[in-house]
Amino acid sequence: MDEGTFKGKVVIAPEVLMTIARLAALSVPGVARMAAVPGGVNRLFQRRPYNEGVRIVVHEHTVRAELHVVVSPGSNMRDVAERVQHEVARAIEQMVGMDVEAVNVHIQDVEYSDAGGE
């Protein structure tokens, strides 16, 4: 059978896109961790899922991502956010082949140590 003659479709679960986006964001220097999505149902039940901090909306063949991050102290927040946008879009386009409409980055906090005076 020649390539391209198969019938059917490929469905990518939103959880896959969330994992790709989360890992891409965490790979950016200056991202300390993901933050809880405000108003998310997982927060109500005190669960911290592997896809925390990521919302994905898929419309046909286009992806829109919302990422909530906590940055490391001393990081340039604008640079970190722009790098997250670039890395998440690149990862989704490269790994899944879907178009990325937008990557919105919400910086929720700065990760400071609880040790006083350090």
Regions found by a protein language model. Name each.
Residues 1-73, 77, 82, 98-118:
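Contiguous, often N-terminal, cationic amphipathic patches that form binding interfaces
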